[in-house]
């Protein structure tokens, strides 16, 4: 799995003119799933994101997690994170998992975050979406499950 994590003051996702998810203070996740990903990858990613210390404490240091600050998460599926632009001018998306494989893993990650007590809003899987956010910092990170112990 590959997740772009953005700290946000506010965010919303719209599908066909209707807001389907919105948060205040928290994180926006752009989530990509590849063929080899499993629910174990989803659990790893959820735990990593829930405990990432990327919110400032009273001293202005990034020492607090989304859990610590009572933040929310807006999770948006994004297969284009596995786009390969090394050859030609059109990205190749062969590394992105097909929807029937990606959806259960994406949902498992969201559920694992909810189980930690985080309010999680989502976009609509597979839909064309408009994502609007106010970046806070900005703080933007990439988290990948291939980095967990034992993966190559």
Swiss-Prot record:
Catalytic activity, reaction form: glycyl-tRNA(Ala) + H2O = tRNA(Ala) + glycine + H(+); a D-aminoacyl-tRNA + H2O = a tRNA + a D-alpha-amino acid + H(+)
Record's keyword annotation contains DNA damage: no
Domain of life: Bacteria
Alphabetized InterPro entries for the sequence: Daa-tRNA_deacyls_DTD, DTD-like_sf
GO biological-process terms attached to the record: D-amino acid catabolic process
GO MF term set: D-tyrosyl-tRNA(Tyr) deacylase activity; Gly-tRNA(Ala) deacylase activity; Ser(Gly)-tRNA(Ala) hydrolase activity; tRNA binding
Pfam families: Tyr_Deacylase (PF02580)
Function according to Swiss-Prot or TrEMBL: An aminoacyl-tRNA editing enzyme that deacylates mischarged D-aminoacyl-tRNAs. Also deacylates mischarged glycyl-tRNA(Ala), protecting cells against glycine mischarging by AlaRS. Acts via tRNA-based rather than protein-based catalysis; rejects L-amino acids rather than detecting D-amino acids in the active site. By recycling D-aminoacyl-tRNA to D-amino acids and free tRNA molecules, this enzyme counteracts the toxicity associated with the formation of D-aminoacyl-tRNA entities in vivo and helps enforce protein L-homochirality.
The protein's name in its UniProt record: D-aminoacyl-tRNA deacylase
């Amino acid at each position: 799995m590959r997740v772009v994590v953005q700290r946000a003051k506010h965010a919303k996702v719209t599908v066909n003119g209707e807001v389907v998810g919105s948060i205040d203070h928290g994180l926006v996740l752009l989530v990509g799933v590849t063929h080899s990903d499993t629910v174990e990858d989803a659990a790893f990613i959820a735990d990593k994101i829930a405990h990432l210390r990327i919110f400032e404490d009273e001293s202005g240091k990034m020492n607090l997690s989304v859990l610590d600050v009572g933040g929310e998460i807006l999770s948006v599926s994004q297969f284009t994170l596995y786009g390969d632009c090394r050859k030609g001018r059109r990205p190749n998306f062969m590394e992105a998992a097909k929807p029937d494989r990606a959806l259960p893993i994406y949902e498992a990650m969201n559920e694992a975050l909810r189980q930690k007590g985080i309010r999680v809003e989502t976009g609509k899987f597979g839909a064309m979406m408009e994502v609007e956010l106010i970046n806070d910092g900005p703080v933007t990170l990439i988290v990948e499950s291939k980095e967990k112990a034992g993966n190559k």
